[in-house]
């Protein structure tokens, strides 16, 4: 069954694009529990456009483009973490920013992942600094007993960095999604098919 949480080592690294590629390849519904910032195309809208799969409505749509805990406070919204529990069945759940981003003043995303016990896919850059960021993220998840399905790299190939992260962490490499340009549904599907084994996500 395709049921994963997609998190990352930082914000803006390509989690949504990878989520869209995985959702399209597997035909799996997508859910972003908390969306912060509504002025531009939202992550759910991007996935709907690129993947063509069912997209569940966000539990919280926050106007302010910031970390959920701050955005909620500015918007006057109290986030109830019980509303963020993923529903049963096949689903791709995307977090916000990195794994240690606060959802509320008391709860980090990694702590939600530990509660959910849904296997996590860690998205990481291939650019300079990714070794430290990736190993810290994986270590933080492991310390909280979060099940880690594997790591996905996004960007140009940097073989040594990708290999050392997998070797040191003991987490398997699932593949690398290159920069897709122009970013169309067809091009994204081709990139996923050329760089990942769909059996790793079933």
Swiss-Prot record:
What species is given as this protein's source?
Sphingopyxis alaskensis (strain DSM 13593 / LMG 18877 / RB2256)
Keywords, A to Z, come to: ATP-binding, Biotin biosynthesis, Cytoplasm, Ligase, Magnesium, Metal-binding, Nucleotide-binding
Q: In which pathway does it act?
A: Cofactor biosynthesis; biotin biosynthesis; biotin from 7,8-diaminononanoate: step 1/2
- Biological processes, Gene Ontology terms: biotin biosynthetic process
Which parts of the sequence bind ATP?
Answer: 12-17, 43, 94-97, 178-180
Q: Can you state which reaction this protein catalyses?
A: (7R,8S)-7,8-diammoniononanoate + CO2 + ATP = (4R,5S)-dethiobiotin + ADP + phosphate + 3 H(+)
This chain's function reads: Catalyzes a mechanistically unusual reaction, the ATP-dependent insertion of CO2 between the N7 and N8 nitrogen atoms of 7,8-diaminopelargonic acid (DAPA, also called 7,8-diammoniononanoate) to form a ureido ring.
- InterPro entries associated with the record: DTB_synth_BioD, P-loop_NTPase
Q: What is the lineage of its organism?
A: Bacteria, Pseudomonadati, Pseudomonadota, Alphaproteobacteria, Sphingomonadales
Binding site residues for substrate: 36
Query: Which residue positions are annotated as catalytic?
Result: 32
Q: What is this protein called?
A: ATP-dependent dethiobiotin synthetase BioD
**Which gene underlies this protein?**
bioD
Protein origin, superkingdom: Bacteria
């Amino acid at each position: 069954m395709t049921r994963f949480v997609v998190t990352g080592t930082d914000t803006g690294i390509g989690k949504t694009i990878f989520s869209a590629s995985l959702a399209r390849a597997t035909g799996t519904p997508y859910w972003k529990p908390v969306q912060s910032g509504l002025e531009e195309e939202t992550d759910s809208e991007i996935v709907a456009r690129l993947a063509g799969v069912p997209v569940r409505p966000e539990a919280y749509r926050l106007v302010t483009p910031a970390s959920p805990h701050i955005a909620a406070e500015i918007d006057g919204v109290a986030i109830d973490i019980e509303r963020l529990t993923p529903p049963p069945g096949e689903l791709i759940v995307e977090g916000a920013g990195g794994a240690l981003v606060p959802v509320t003043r008391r709860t980090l995303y990694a702590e939600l992942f530990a509660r959910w016990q849904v296997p996590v896919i860690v998205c990481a850059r291939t650019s300079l600094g990714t070794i430290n960021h990736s190993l810290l993220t994986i270590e933080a998840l492991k310390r909280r007993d979060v099940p880690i399905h594997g790591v996905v790299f996004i960007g140009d190939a940097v073989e040594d960095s990708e290999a050392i992260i997998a070797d040191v962490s003991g987490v398997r490499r699932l593949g690398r999604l290159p920069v897709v340009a122009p970013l169309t549904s067809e091009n994204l599907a081709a990139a996923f098919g050329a760089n990942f084994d769909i059996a790793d996500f079933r």
